[in-house]
Every structure is written in C-alpha cells, then in structure tokens.
Amino acid sequence: MASLRKTHPLFKIMNDALIDLPAPSNISAWWNFGSLLLLCLMVQIITGLFLAMHYTSDISTAFSSVVHICRDVNYGWVIRNFHANGASFFFICIYLHIGRGLYYGSYLYKETWNIGVVLLLLVMMTAFVGYVLPWGQMSFWGATVITNLLSAVPYMGDTLVQWIWGGFSVDNATLTRFFAFHFLLPFTIIAATILHALFLHETGSNNPIGLNSDADKISFHPYFSYKDLLGFIILLTALMSLSLFSPNFLGDPENFTPANPLVTPPHIKPEWYFLFAYAILRSIPNKLGGVLALLFSILVLMVVPLLHLSKQQGLTFRPLSQILFWTLVADVMILTWIGGMPVEHPFIIIGQIASILYFSLFLILNPLAAWLENKLLNLNCSSSLATKAPVL
C-alpha cells in the first residue's frame, strides 16, 4: 500500500515539493537562499503580527506605541528588534539569491526569474511603508522625499502624490494607509512566492556547472532538508546575535526623535538596503530622469535573460564574464556607500560614474563579453580540430 504522503491530495503536494523532489546532486550552499528567504518571511510575518497587536497607526500615538512595545510589553523589545533586523537579513538573503541567479544563469528560467523580480519590488515596497510606521524623523522625511518623487510623473504627478498622501502633506491619513499596506503586502508576497516555487518546479533547479542534471538527481529529503536546516541555524544565530547585542547597529539615530515637519534632518537617507538605488536616483540632476533610473535599476533584471548571448548557462567556465560579475558586486557596494554620503564633491561624481557602470555592465559589457567568449570558444574548437593528428 502506498504511503499516505504520496496519496493524500494535500500531503502529496507537500511531498512533491519538499520530500521526494528530485534535486541535482551537486548544488552548493548558494542554493540554500530560497529556503532561507522563506524562513525570513515567516519570522517577519510572525513578529509583525505581534507588533501589530500593540501598534497604533495615529500620528499622535505611533511613536509612543513603539516605545510602549519596547518598554511595557512582555518581550516586546525582542519582537521589535527581531522584526527590524529581520528586514536587513531578508534583504541580505535576497541580494545573495539574485547574485547566485546572475552568476549561474538561473535567469534563463524566465517565468521564475520574472516572478522573482516582481517579488523583489513587492518586498521593497513593503519595507519602505514599514519604515514609515515608527513615525520618527527619518520615517517622516523618508516618506516625504520618496513619495514626492511621484510628482515627476508628467501631467498627473501632483494629483498622484496628494492621492497617496491623502491630503496636502504626509499626515495621519498617510500613516494609516501605509500601515494597511504594510499589513496586507506580506500576504501578497506569500502568493507570489507560491507562484515562484510553482514555476521553479516546472523546470527543476539549475546547478553550478550549468549542465542537464536529469541523469544525476537525488531526493530533497534527507539530503537538502538537513543542508537547509544548517542554513536556518546559521541565519537565526546571526539574527539573534545582532538583535540582542547591537539591535540599533543598522538603524538611523534620527529615528529616535519623534517626527517633526518643521525640522529637516541634515541628511535624509533610506535604510542601508535601498542605498544603492538611492545613489542612482541622486546621480541624475533631473527629477524625472532620476525616478526612471531608480525604477530601471531594479527592472533592468528583467532584461538580463534577453541579453544572454553566451553558449553556456553560468559563469563557471567564463573568466571574462566572471570579472564583470565581481565588478558589478563591487559597483553595488560603492553605490551603497555613496547613497549614505552627503551630496557634495567627490561623492557626486563617484556616484555618477558608478551609476553609469551599473547600467553599462548589464546592457553593454556583459553581452559583449559573452559574444567575445563565444568567438574564443569557436576559435579554440577550430584550432584543436585543425591540429588533431589523422587516425591511421
């Protein structure tokens, strides 16, 4: 008689996704980040739910309610610190997950990749509206600056901004709707995650050497379930260490001051995980141009599969493209640094050069390197055939 997990309609779905799923035998720890992101999402939803039980989305009490959570609610400070730092770990895992996809050519699974980009946009939107909720100085001014960017939309910009604000400035209506969005969007993220996994399981996972692995598959459980469990332990240990020893390390000191529309902070900046996009936005003097550059800094990922010219899937055996990949990693780090710096010389010009390089790597240099590698590969094959000794 067949096992219940293979026959029961509900258990069968879970079995096919988590237990008997055929996985390539050679996938490395870089393939752990999908499950780590799911763990991060669960941590954020659970901690967020408990925070929402005590938070009040009113400008007169929002800041005080966060203070109340940290001081008076049982383990409220732990929940709050886990939620705030959990967002940072979420983005660390996302960026590593995207980096893995770019390095090993996972973007060639177009449906999975495009849903992934949509997921990134949803998570960024959720994190942005969530950052506004404590109603500190940086929350208020961050919301004002970023929402104000929509005024760059031709014809309807000003109307659009006022519609989002619910008035003529960031006020009570803005905070209330941002809280509603912050509560709702994670459930949209769950739906998109299910689609992401569904499309992935249509094709199966890629592997480090980029070859077809149908001939060498192993079951997900116990091999990769235990491997993922190790990743969970490392991630949770790191999250707990940061949340308990240095909970405010990644935050902004300005957010310890209640929001004041009459006092502008000396330097308005978003959380560290948005700084690379913020640097690209600031590097263009024109407002509409900056907004478009900000949008395309994320949407450029959707173009990557269309610009894949190489005969190989990943970068494992492509030294030129590897150099460009690590240049991109360094470039994003430079942009992150520049995003946190004041708008003055030499940071302006460094940001502009780094922004040009960012788009050049995606749109020009990578396709060019792939084309050149194909030529070198053909040349090598031709020369090896020409020099091969005749068989007697």
UniProtKB/Swiss-Prot annotation:
Q: Where are the transmembrane segments?
A: 33-53, 77-98, 113-133, 178-198, 226-246, 288-308, 320-340, 347-367
Question: Which positions in this protein are listed as binding heme b b562?
Answer: 83, 182
Main location class:
mitochondrion
Q: Which BP terms does GO give this entry?
A: mitochondrial electron transport, ubiquinol to cytochrome c
Query: What is the protein's membrane topology class?
Result: Multi-pass membrane protein
Where is heme b b566 annotated to bind?
A: 97, 196
Extract the PROSITE patterns matched here: CYTB_CTER, CYTB_NTER
Q: Which cysteines are joined by disulfide bonds?
A: none
**Residues bound to a ubiquinone:** 201
The cofactor binding remark recorded in the entry reads: Binds 2 heme b groups non-covalently.
Q: Which UniProt keywords apply?
A: Electron transport, Heme, Iron, Membrane, Metal-binding, Mitochondrion, Mitochondrion inner membrane, Respiratory chain, Transmembrane, Transmembrane helix, Transport, Ubiquinone
Cell compartment(s), UniProt: Mitochondrion inner membrane
Record-level Gene Ontology MF annotations: metal ion binding; ubiquinol-cytochrome-c reductase activity
A GO cellular component term found in this entry reads: mitochondrial inner membrane
Sequence similarity: Belongs to the cytochrome b family.
Question: Which additional comment does the entry carry?
Answer: Heme 1 (or BL or b562) is low-potential and absorbs at about 562 nm, and heme 2 (or BH or b566) is high-potential and absorbs at about 566 nm.
SUBUNIT field: The cytochrome bc1 complex contains 3 respiratory subunits (MT-CYB, CYC1 and UQCRFS1), 2 core proteins (UQCRC1 and UQCRC2) and probably 6 low-molecular weight proteins.
The job of this chain, per UniProt, is described as: Component of the ubiquinol-cytochrome c reductase complex (complex III or cytochrome b-c1 complex) that is part of the mitochondrial respiratory chain. The b-c1 complex mediates electron transfer from ubiquinol to cytochrome c. Contributes to the generation of a proton gradient across the mitochondrial membrane that is then used for ATP synthesis.
Give the protein name, as stated in the record: Cytochrome b
Q: Which organism is it from?
A: Clarias fuscus
Which taxonomic lineage is given here?
Eukaryota, Metazoa, Chordata, Craniata, Vertebrata
